[in-house]
Amino acid sequence: MFLKKIYIFLPLLAMTIMAYGEETAKESPFSASLELSTKYMWRGIEYGTAPTVFPMIGYNTHGFNAFAMGGYAIDGSHQEVDLGVSYTSSEFTVGVSDYYYPSSVGEKDQYFKLSNRETGHWVEAYATWAGIKVPLWVTVSTYIFGADKNTDGKQMYSSYAEVGYTHSFTEDNNIALCVGANLNKGFYTNNQSGFNVVNINAKYSTALKFGNFKLPVSASYVLNPYNNKSFFTMSLYFGL
């Protein structure tokens, strides 16, 4: 879901993976990136144990951002296709993302089955404040449509909030700390419990230097107090 990530963009949909290279006279509004991760973690939830590839393309102009992103485990255990749009003004971002999970047998998928009772899409609305003068961010999100249902088939409106802080040691070395919690009984606790802390994350980012080339890398420690689980992941980022 991501973003799933990460890190990708918008603190779970708000971080932009940057390419390190020669500057051009005029930047293109289009971008493309690739993340290689040792496993897929998102908001304290483990989506599989296999290394996962996250390709992404984006378009950004005058505060408007649109993206398409995939998530593919190398053992075939997970597939994901995400689309999203957002708008940023100063320190505030609002957006909508659509997360879709194809089955392992592609011909059985019905991407355009959009009836709220039957669709496999998960549609989320979110708002983010990211400080300009202070390195803090706050994100609140809610699933507003799609497969986020309870056993009775009713929309759960699973909601999540996250508070984070970033500290930069140097231009290429920083650490991000965040705490996230589900706000109601829903997806993040398997519809078993209301408010709970489900994600405590410490992420260190740096760049490996090879002459004039820099390869962004990160290492993350993730703790989910609700599930009593902890994880460690590493990622490489390539800007295209």
Language-model segment annotations:
Residues 22-73:
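Short glycine/proline- and aromatic-enriched beta-strand/turn motifs that initiate or cap beta-hairpins
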Residues 174-210:
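Outer membrane beta-barrel transmembrane domains
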Residues 22-29, 95, 130-135, 168-175, ...:
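Short loop/turn motifs that connect adjacent beta-strands in outer-membrane beta-barrel proteins
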